[in-house]
Amino acid sequence: MRTDDFLWKYLFYPIGCREVAWSSCPQGHVIGATGLYIRIEDLVKHGSIYLNGGTYKNKRILSQSWVDTVFAKGYEFKTYDNGVTFEKGGMNGQRVVIVPHLNRVVAWLGYGENDFKNLTTQ
């Protein structure tokens, strides 16, 4: 199964994403590391899955074990505030920030690597 087909079946459709696109190489394979085009609302949904231990609207999307692995220091998310705030960045400054102790997910679609940094330091 192609990567994008797998994600549509097990992630995008189950959480209600309908407008997602992914860049592909000349052979038609998705470029997994970059090129995901997603609405900000859907990026927040993705973050909320992690905030809620792998569930979205009480439906299991990811295993708790996977969520724990992703939050492990140095694995996938950057950590701030002594490990209680998590941030994952994308190309051109896109960010999703998860703050479990405040029950919050914040998403940012920027255009430039320093957009988010400039916003948070002003």
Predicted regions and their residues:
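Carbohydrate-binding/catalytic loop surfaces
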Residues: 25-38, 81-83, 89-91
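Non-transmembrane alpha-helical segments in soluble domains
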Residues: 7-8, 12, 44-51, 67-71, ...
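Structural helix-adjacent loops and short alpha-helical linkers that scaffold large soluble proteins
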Residues: 1-8, 54-62
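Active-site Gly/Thr loop motif
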Residues: 17-19, 63-116
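C-terminal, helix-dominated tail/subdomain
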Residues: 40-43, 57-71
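Active-site-proximal alpha-helical segments within enzyme catalytic domains
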Residues: 34-55, 94-111
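Active-site helix/loop module of the DD-peptidase/beta-lactamase fold
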Residues: 2-34
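Short, gly/Ser/Thr-rich active-site loops of penicillin-recognizing serine hydrolases
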Residues: 117-122
